[in-house]
């Protein structure tokens, strides 16, 4: 495992604690502890939390594939950072889009979701292509 992968993986594992905290907050919202959220907001919060967790797991797995594909600087760094940034951007888009009292429509911060989708897509294509080229 490369030092670059160890660095990004270590940061991602530490970031999982924020997803855990978000889960306790989400549980409070869904249980009615925090009143005043619309169904739209609750749905966006659920989606943001779920995407953060799933995309973080994908990022950790992709880091190992990045090493196997032989991707090194600067493309390797771009792929690693792209996979690590995608969960943050996508979940920020879901959470940010739901901000505002009584919100029932996505706000302007939904743009972060789409930025995250494109970053993730680019990282997937680069890594997938590199893996196909690295076949022995």
Where are the predicted features?
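Polytopic transmembrane helical bundles with strong interfacial aromatic enrichment
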Residues: 1-136
